[in-house]
Amino acid sequence: PLYSSAASDVYKRQVVHIDLTKAQVKRLGRNTDVEGRLNKLLTKGDVWVKHFEPAPAGFDARFSAINRRYIYKIADKSSPKSPQLVRYALYHLRTLDEKKMHDAAQALKGLHDFASYCKPRAFGSTIRELQKISVTRKNGVIEIELVADAFAHNMVRSIVGALIKVGDGKASKEDLARVLAMRKRTST
C-alpha cells in the first residue's frame, strides 16, 4: 500500500492510501516528482497531493489513524459577513458566548460512553476518548476543535449542537455532563 496527503480547504492534511500492484509501482518509476504526476490526474484542483511514500504493509488511512480531528466553524451574529464563509461555516443568528461553550466542553473531555451524543450503529461501540475539545473565536468566527481516537456516527454534530445551546444560554456545563451520564440519546 501507498499513501499520500491530500489538501483542500475542507479536508486539509488528510491521509489517503492507494493499493497499487507491483506493475503499477514499476510504471510510476522512481520519478522524483510522483506528487506532480498524481496531481496532473487531479485536474479540478480541489484536492492535490503534497507527499507520497510507501506505507507499511496493512496500513489503512481510515483504520490506522492514531486520532481524528474536526474543526467546526460557526459564524454568529457578531461574525464578519463574508461570502467565503458560506461553504465552510454554520450560520447562527444570535451571538454565542464562546467562553461558556469552551468551559462546558471540558465536561466531555476524556474516555466516555458517548451514546447520548451519537446515533449508535449495530455492533458499533459508542465509547470514545475525546482527547481535546476547545472553543475559540478566530477572526470573528467560532472554531470548535475536537480530537478523538475515533468519532461515533453524528457525534461531532451532536456535541456542536449541545455547545450552541450553551452559547445561547439555554444549557449549562452541568447539563452536558448530565446528558453524557444518561448514555441514551433523547432527541434526533
Predicted regions and their residues:
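Short amphipathic alpha-helical signal-transduction/dimerization elements
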Residues: 106-109, 160-168
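A common structural junction motif
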Residues: 40-46, 163-168
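Short, structured active-site "lid" loops
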Residues: 12-37
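Conserved helix-adjacent loop modules within structured domains
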Residues: 139, 143-153, 170-174, 178-179
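Pseudouridine synthases involved in rRNA/tRNA modification
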Residues: 163-188
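Single conserved hydrophobic/aromatic residue that forms the stacking wall/gate
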Residues: 1-7, 11
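Non-catalytic RNA-recognition surface used by pseudouridine synthases
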Residues: 46-147
